[in-house]
């Protein structure tokens, strides 16, 4: 900043004459009217349309056809106010809404002068949006309508995407009544938050206010957009967001790869690949030709996009938001790069656009915006002077006055560029203060923006929002607005007209059954429900069809289940169970049963191979129970170097009578040994193995019945949860825990009343000693005597203990004081002044503490005697103690003495 010399201050008088060019303006208006009357209306329309087609890349078009450009966007310099109409209005607007301060009037006068100069310099240019009537019908400068505000909600603190989406959802977009002309109003962002309806200029102003409050260098852009943009027509736009689809992991058994240490070398390839190579060359050549052709078509399409689709192609006014990255005034970290000289320099500013009606963020090359007329923030107003055919060609360095015309010279220091010689220093140059007397932008006249918690949670004006895209319909709902807790629904269609549905995605929140996502496929009539963790049955997802006879898959969180069940596949004649990380290494079970579900036909179990650290008696790979064939088949894991697996097949012998042991018959056992050198199992080992399998078979039958019962319970529970969904809320939710808060407040009030009641009543010394006799209506004389003595003895012991502690403290202080005095007297000449004064002060402190303890000891002794007598008298007068008359008289006489 240049130095400011106050001693050189000289009063500067400057007058702005609004009627200075009135004669010239009047002459120009008369010439335009005379030229318009000489030609008929049809020729005028044809000439204007041809001029537009010739200058389609330029922004110099008249905004209105019949009205002279000098009168478009004119600011009323009589500065009308609406005090009488809105001073006592029901809306309770602040005075800044319907009045104009002297600085505002000067600013409007400056803006009108700036507008007229720009119209004279560029007569064919579109009119500027400088000052529009607000909700109180008072013209306000657009820069002062921006009210930077930071909100307390985490979503609105720093994320540009979340802020843009919130504004698009919170405010209902209304297209301009006449998009060819300038907007006829610009209400404040504070009023817009209450009305929840606004046009593009009002929504852009609100969005910029929130972005600036969050620390982003945002500006409002006024320009020209395509028709579908100003109408917020999304029918030709594909669904822009990624589909949040929760996929369930399929259980895949671990497949052990065979060792690759010894591997046969492959045979040499003796086949000619000339034809394949030639085909690949032709394919690459065709791909290159296709790429070149596509590039030519793309360039032709870009040129065709510059043509006006109708006579109003370059005249539809619209407002959006631009964020200039690497802006000089931005508080965000700057982007740098290393130039050819090796110096680290600041990168040029770049921009991104935000559409306030949709919340979409795009680069400057997006085709929905055609022209940029002007931009503004809370500091200044900038007019685009660049000749451009596409918005992507614009340069966004606002300090360059060749590209951007500044309205107010009183800008922040970061936006100033001083033209000086190379040997001069800006910081050392002395400038007169009169040179800094530039007009700058004043503070906003808008009240501080506020969004209540209920409105923030509601988000949508009618608690729901529905948008139809190309081939998709997106519906969103406010939390707790739907009975089933639905917050979003996305339907994908097979055609662009959204008539043939394909897939429907439903998203839920705050459900007591913890369901969060449902996917329905129309072609297969399949449902898929996804749940969060925390259910009692550890349910993760369910896949089923509308027809209950078809396959159903139930996924579980295996870590929270005792049996480590991960997947259950239910079919009419079979049941498949997948496990994960079980101690017995079982990962697969399959039950085959009759359609009625009451008779087992076959059970197959598969086990993982035990590692070297696991203790496993039988390394079984597959165990099969064939109930109809009355057999048990055991297949063991492959041993080292074996090409096949060992198999043991038992034919179950007839069951013995009750109390008798099973008789083993080796003829009913078939054994296949993969390695003949392996030791042969003895009959005793086979007998024990058979007994284990028969015992486990009985366990399987009982387990099958329990599994079937659990399956029915799961599906019955889901049926009731879908029929009567219940929602839950947090105990910290201030909007929905009113009943709980009322209970807590009532308990707090009762506790406070109890404390006040206890404080107002005299102390009850006898209450703790009557607890053992609480079930008696009246105490006996012996019990009364015991309670009386216990109360007085406790009081006496308390006072004695307190006096003993004080006496001990006094003696310690006395001993320490004497020791310190003897030490000072003995070594008085060996201390310097500082240490000696410190020790003397310590001795004085000890004497002071000793006097304080002595005084407290005296007062405590006196008060203890008084309190003892008070308690004794109160006990004698207490009607709950049943003393004999002679004892009572004797005690009273002792008390009087």
Curated annotation (Swiss-Prot):
Query: Which superkingdom?
Result: Eukaryota
Residue spans making up a coiled coil are 269-306, 801-858
A single GO cellular-component term from the record reads:
motile cilium
- List compositional bias (Acidic residues) regions by residue number: 40-49
Q: Gene3D superfamilies recorded for this chain?
A: 3.10.620.30
The answer to whether keyword Ribosomal protein applies is no
Q: Quote the InterPro entries the UniProt record gives.
A: DRC7/lobo, DRC7_C, MORN_DRC7, Papain-like_cys_pep_sf, Transglutaminase-like
Q: Membrane-crossing residues?
A: none
Q: Which SUPFAM superfamilies match?
A: Cysteine proteinases (SSF54001)
Of which family is this protein a member?
Answer: Belongs to the DRC7 family.
Explain the purpose of this protein.
Key component of the nexin-dynein regulatory complex (N-DRC), essential for N-DRC integrity. Involved in the regulation of flagellar motility. Involved in sperm motility. Required for the sperm to enter in the coiled storage seminal receptacle (SR) tubule.
* Name this protein carries in UniProt: Coiled-coil domain-containing protein lobo
């Amino acid at each position: 900043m240049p130095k400011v010399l106050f001693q050189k201050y000289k009063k500067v008088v400057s007058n702005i004459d609004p009627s200075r060019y009135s004669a010239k303006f009047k002459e120009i208006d008369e010439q335009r009217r005379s030229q318009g009357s000489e030609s008929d209306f049809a020729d005028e329309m044809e000439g204007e349309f041809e001029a537009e087609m010739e200058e389609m890349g330029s922004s110099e078009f008249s905004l209105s056809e019949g009205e002279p450009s000098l009168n478009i966007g004119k600011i009323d310099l009589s500065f009308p106010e609406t005090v009488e109409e809105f001073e006592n209005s029901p809306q309770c607007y602040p005075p800044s809404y319907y009045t104009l301060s002297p600085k505002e009037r000067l600013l409007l006068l400056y803006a009108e002068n700036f507008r007229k100069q720009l119209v004279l310099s560029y007569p064919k240019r579109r009119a500027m949006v400088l000052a529009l009537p607000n909700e109180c019908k008072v013209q306000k400068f657009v820069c002062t309508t921006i009210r930077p505000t930071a909100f307390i909600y985490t979503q609105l603190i720093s994320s540009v995407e979340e802020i843009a989406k919130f504004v698009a959802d919170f405010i209902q977009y209304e297209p301009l009544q006449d998009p060819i002309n300038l907007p006829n109003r610009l209400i404040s962002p504070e009023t817009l938050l209450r009305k929840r309806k606004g046009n593009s200029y009002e929504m852009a102003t609100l969005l910029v206010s929130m972005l600036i409050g969050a620390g982003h260098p945002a500006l409002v852009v006024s320009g020209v957009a395509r028709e579908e943009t100003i109408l917020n027509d999304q029918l030709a736009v594909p669904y822009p967001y990624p589909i949040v689809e929760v996929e369930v992991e399929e259980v895949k058994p671990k497949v052990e790869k065979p060792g690759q240490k010894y591997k046969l070398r492959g045979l040499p390839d003796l086949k000619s690949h000339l034809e394949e190579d030639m085909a690949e060359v032709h394919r690459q050549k065709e791909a290159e030709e296709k790429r070149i052709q596509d590039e030519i078509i793309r360039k032709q399409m870009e040129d065709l996009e510059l043509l006006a689709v109708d006579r109003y192609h370059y005249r539809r006014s619209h407002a959006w938001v631009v964020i200039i990255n690497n802006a000089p005034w931005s508080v965000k970290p700057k982007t740098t790069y290393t130039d050819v000289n090796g110096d680290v320099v600041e990168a040029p500013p770049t921009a991104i656009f935000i559409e306030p009606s949709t919340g979409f963020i795009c680069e400057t090359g997006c085709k929905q915006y055609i022209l940029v007329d002007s931009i503004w923030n809370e500091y200044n107003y900038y007019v685009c002077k660049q000749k451009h055919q596409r918005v992507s060609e614009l340069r966004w360095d606002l300090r360059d006055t060749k590209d951007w015309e500044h309205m107010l010279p009183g800008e922040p220091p970061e936006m100033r560029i001083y033209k000086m010689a190379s040997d001069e220093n800006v910081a050392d140059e002395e400038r007169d203060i009169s040179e800094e007397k530039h007009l700058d932008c004043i503070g906003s006249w808008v009240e501080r923006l506020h969004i209540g918690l209920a409105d923030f949670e509601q988000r949508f004006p009618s608690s729901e929002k529905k948008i139809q895209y190309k081939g998709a319909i997106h519906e969103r709902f406010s939390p707790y607005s739907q009975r089933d807790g639905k917050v979003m629904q996305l339907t994908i269609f097979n055609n662009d007209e959204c008539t043939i549905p394909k897939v429907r995605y439903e998203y839920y929140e705050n459900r007591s059954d913890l369901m969060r996502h449902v996917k329905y496929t129309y072609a297969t009539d399949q449902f898929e429900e996804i749940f969060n963790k925390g259910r009692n049955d550890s349910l993760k997802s369910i896949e089923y069809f509308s027809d209950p006879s078809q396959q159903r898959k139930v996924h579980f969180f295996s870590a929270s289940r005792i049996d480590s069940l991960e997947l259950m596949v239910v079919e009419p004649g079979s049941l498949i169970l997948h496990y994960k990380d079980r101690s017995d290494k079982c990962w697969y079970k399959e039950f085959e049963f009759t359609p009625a579900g009451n008779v087992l036909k076959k059970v197959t179990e598969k086990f993982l191979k035990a590692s070297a650290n696991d203790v496993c008696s039988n390394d079984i790979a597959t165990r099969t129970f064939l109930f109809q064939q009355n057999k048990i088949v055991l297949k063991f894991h492959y041993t080292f170097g074996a090409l096949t697996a060992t198999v043991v097949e038992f034919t179950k012998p007839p069951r013995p009578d009750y109390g008798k042991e099973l008789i083993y018959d080796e003829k009913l056992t078939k054994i296949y040994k993969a390695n003949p050198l392996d030791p042969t199992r003895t009959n005793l080992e086979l007998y024990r193995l058979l007994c284990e399998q028969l015992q486990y078979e009985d366990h399987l039958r009982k387990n099958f019945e329990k599994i079937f019962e659990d399956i029915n319970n799961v599906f019955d529970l889901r049926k009731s949860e879908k029929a009567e969904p219940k929602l839950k809320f947090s105990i910290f939710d201030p909007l929905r825990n009113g009943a709980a808060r009322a209970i807590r407040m009532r308990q707090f009030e009762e506790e406070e009343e109890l404390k006040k009641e206890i404080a107002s009543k005299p102390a009850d010394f006898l209450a703790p000693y009557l607890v053992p006799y609480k079930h008696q209506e009246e105490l006996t004389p012996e019990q009364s005597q015991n309670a009386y003595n216990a109360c007085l003895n406790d009081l006496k012991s308390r006072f004695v203990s307190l006096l003993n502690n004080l006496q001990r403290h006094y003696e310690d202080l006395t001993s320490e004081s004497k020791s310190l005095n003897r030490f000072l007297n003995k070594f008085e000449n060996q201390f310097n002044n500082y240490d000696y004064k410190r020790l003397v002060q310590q001795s004085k402190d000890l004497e002071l503490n000793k006097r304080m303890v002595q005084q407290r000891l005296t007062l405590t002794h006196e008060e203890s005697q008084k309190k003892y007598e008070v308690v004794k008298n109160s006990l004698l007068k207490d009607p709950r103690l049943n003393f004999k008359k002679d004892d009572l008289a004797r005690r009273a006489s002792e008390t009087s003495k």
